Regions:
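Beta-rich, blade/repeat-based domains predominating
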Residues: 100-115, 169-193, 218-238, 245-246, ...
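Short, conserved, GDST-rich strand-edge loop motifs in beta-rich repeat architectures
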Residues: 62-65, 120-134, 187-193, 239-256, ...
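Blade-edge beta-strand/turn elements of extracellular beta-propeller
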Residues: 78-100, 150-170, 206-221, 260-280, ...
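Beta-strand-rich domains and repeat architectures in extracellular enzymes and scaffolds
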Residues: 35-137
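Fungal secretory targeting signals
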Residues: 1-27
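Blade-loop segments of beta-propeller domains
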Residues: 100, 124-191, 213-218
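Blade-level signature of beta-propeller repeat domains, shared across WD40, Kelch, NHL, RCC1
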Residues: 380-413
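Short loop/turn segments immediately following beta-strands, especially the blade-tip
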Residues: 142-152, 203-207, 317-324, 402-410
Length: 413
């Protein structure tokens, strides 16, 4: 939808909030025009806490003294002063496109530096999209050359950036995750029915978008529905998550193999398990130095089977050993609104996660620094070099400017 003009509501500044603002001002970091401080202490005690039927993973939390409109009016939410260095002096958020009820802006966000294009895909398995079993989700792209300074200065710039459908040859079936890889785009395909196996595909970055399958089995066995993919910056090995969202969204068979994280070396052909013990392994990324891996578990969402709030909505951090295996699992963060889907890091090692109300930002220790608040689900997003980010909010496509820089521009191995 196209957002109506929002009326600003001044935040209630007291206690920790006032102290945070005073500290920021003393350091010369005034709160930017599109940012606001959120005082977590102000809602430590609510008095009347809603029952789980009212407040759960699927509901937005509106802090006391704010409204949904005021939260969106100033969408860069500061939970810790470190966030000021991430967003910079003048962060902006711009709506580029809206698709009604069809979730056209879902995942697989990839920025190609040589063309300044950003690729992304439609949601596979969503009833509103009609994709999954009978029709594959599609790949699309935009050119950031169309996002001029005048466009990014607007809050609503719908109609000013063109979205193009990308037709790969042969077709990439139900693409979901993606990353740059060896001057190509590496896609995770979820498969379709029992005969079209989930697979890893590589596609050229330019037309005619030739595609090749590089992996579609483990010793003759299909994967469940490959969800996301990342490259270890130390070794160039491919890591991918395999989960059962294809099954719980009715376009893949029931569990065919354990849900886990896999490691693949395209040069040697070796495929091995990197980690297991998940309910629904989903997003994956690495720290800038490749010594740590982050994996999300979105088990609380079970597709057409509903939800189970006792299942994970968590981000886990691992050490990555010299041999590429994962060890020392640590619970890095738990998400209250929605689930942590796509994850990425900046050059300083801060972790960004697409969640149920926007993009959450954590420092390397797991402290919540701030949010880019959309007010709806962000399945994924991607840095486009320094100071730019494209955000996929299912039926809405956003462009943000900030100070931070993505850790793996191009990520060409």
């Amino acid at each position: 939808m196209v957002h109506a003009r929002r009326t600003s509501l001044a935040p209630l500044l007291s206690g920790v909030t006032a102290l945070l603002l005073a500290t920021a001002t003393a350091q010369g970091n005034n709160v930017p025009a599109q940012a606001q401080v959120i005082n977590q202490k102000s809602f430590n005690v609510l008095g009347d806490v809603p029952p789980p039927t009212v407040a759960n993973y699927s509901t937005l939390f509106i802090p006391p003294g704010t409204t949904k409109d005021s939260l969106f009016e100033k969408p860069f939410h500061i939970y810790d002063e470190e966030f000021l260095d991430i967003i910079g002096a003048n962060p902006t958020l711009t709506l580029l496109k809206s698709s009604g009820t069809n979730p056209m802006f879902h995942e697989a966000a990839v920025w190609v530096p040589s063309t300044d294009d950003v690729f992304f895909v439609q949601n596979a398995g969503d009833p509103a999209a009609g994709t999954g079993l009978n029709r594959s989700a599609i790949i699309q792209r935009i050119s950031l050359s169309q996002v001029t300074a005048d466009v990014s200065a607007e809050r609503n710039a719908t109609g000013k950036v063109d979205v193009h459908v990308v037709v790969a040859t042969p077709a990439i079936i139900n693409p979901n995750g993606a990353t740059n890889y060896r001057n190509r785009i590496l896609f995770a395909g979820e498969g379709q029915g029992s005969r079209v196996a989930p697979a890893l595909y590589v596609m050229s970055q330019n037309a005619p978008y030739n595609a090749t399958v590089i992996l579609d089995n483990y010793f003759g066995r299909q994967f469940n529905s490959i969800n996301d993919v990342a490259i270890n910056p130390r070794t160039g090995d491919i890591y991918f998550t395999d989960t059962t969202y294809g099954y719980v969204q009715d376009f893949r068979p029931e569990n065919v193999i354990q849900k886990q994280v896999w490691r693949f070396n395209e040069t040697s052909g070796a495929v091995a398990v990197a980690a297991d013990g998940f309910n629904m392994p989903n997003g994956i990324t690495f720290s800038p130095d490749g010594h740590h891996a982050y994996v999300t578990d979105t088990g609380v969402i079970q597709g057409f089977f509903g939800r189970n709030s006792s299942f994970p909505s968590s981000i886990y951090r691992y050490d990555v050993e010299e041999d590429g295996t994962f060890s020392n699992r640590k619970t890095f963060a738990f998400i209250a609104t929605g689930v942590p889907d796509g994850v990425h890091v900046d050059t300083k090692g801060n972790l960004y996660a697409g969640c149920g109300d926007g993009v959450h930002v954590y420092n390397p220790s797991g402290k919540l620094l701030g949010k880019i608040w959309i007010g709806s689900t962000v399945a994924n997003f991607q840095f486009a070099g320094k100071g730019r980010m494209v955000i996929l909010a299912e039926t809405e496509l956003y462009y943000a400017t900030l100070k931070a820089e993505g850790a793996f521009p191009g990520q060409l191995y």
